[in-house]
Amino acid sequence: MLMSILLRSVTELCPVYSPFFGSMGITASIVFTVFGGAYGTAKSSVGISSVGVMKPEFIVRSVAPVVFAGIIGLYGLIVCILLFINVTKSEYSLNRAFLDLGAGLTCGLCGLASGMAIGISGDCGVRGAAQQPKLFVGMLICLIFSEALALYGFIVALIMASTGENSCVATASSSSA
């Protein structure tokens, strides 16, 4: 694999630094989604711990925010794997590299925002549902919509990772512009 990277055709469309931008997309995808998931888990776990002191029987129902926060990291992992497949190809254009960078940032930052929303709403929701059980459904709805933020970024990242040209040879349409 290292030999194929060293033997890449270096042209104006495929400079030697193209993999750097793709690698930054991979890094952004996994790092930001894991940060979001970790924040969501930690923040909502504080609420679960305090609820466990008041009402120990409510702990099992209270783990929903932790599950939702854990799923965010999976989105980043899937995008990370797809982008890695693109970066390790023998021809890797600058166009493809920037698309991969955008895909990684999209998935990662949406995952970070989603994790923060899940953590805050999960913490408050768990505490509120322990005092008033009718709030549990409202908490779940807030968590679902918070998770949807990460899902939107995941879908856009998949579209970006699967589209775009990855050719190091100028075509007739690109050379006439």
From Swiss-Prot:
Keywords: Hydrogen ion transport, Ion transport, Membrane, Transmembrane, Transmembrane helix, Transport, Vacuole
Any one GO molecular function term: proton-transporting ATPase activity, rotational mechanism
Topology class, membrane: Multi-pass membrane protein
InterPro entries xref list: ATPase_proteolipid_c-like_dom, ATPase_proteolipid_csu, ATPase_proteolipid_su_C_euk, F/V-ATP_Csub_sf
Gene Ontology annotations for the cellular component aspect, listed alphabetically: contractile vacuolar membrane; membrane; proton-transporting V-type ATPase, V0 domain; vacuolar proton-transporting V-type ATPase complex
Subcellular location: Vacuole membrane
Entry-linked SUPFAM superfamilies: F1F0 ATP synthase subunit C
Coiled coil regions, renumbered to chain: none
Site note Essential for proton translocation, residues: 147
Record-annotated membrane-spanning stretches: 20-40, 65-85, 101-121, 140-160
Gene3D superfamilies listed in its UniProt record: lithium bound rotor ring of v- atpase (1.20.120.610)
Record carries keyword Repeat: no
Superkingdom assignment: Eukaryota
Cytoplasmic side, ranges: 41-64, 122-139
Record note on quaternary structure: V-ATPase is a heteromultimeric enzyme made up of two complexes: the ATP-hydrolytic V1 complex and the proton translocation V0 complex. The V1 complex consists of three catalytic AB heterodimers that form a heterohexamer, three peripheral stalks each consisting of EG heterodimers, one central rotor including subunits D and F, and the regulatory subunits C and H. The proton translocation complex V0 consists of the proton transport subunit a, a ring of proteolipid subunits c9c'', rotary subunit d, subunits e and f.
Its job: Proton-conducting pore forming subunit of the V0 complex of vacuolar(H+)-ATPase (V-ATPase), a multisubunit enzyme composed of a peripheral complex (V1) that hydrolyzes ATP and a membrane integral complex (V0) that translocates protons. V-ATPase is responsible for acidifying and maintaining the pH of intracellular compartments.
Protein's UniProt name: V-type proton ATPase 16 kDa proteolipid subunit c
Species annotation: Entamoeba histolytica (strain ATCC 30459 / HM-1:IMSS / ABRM)
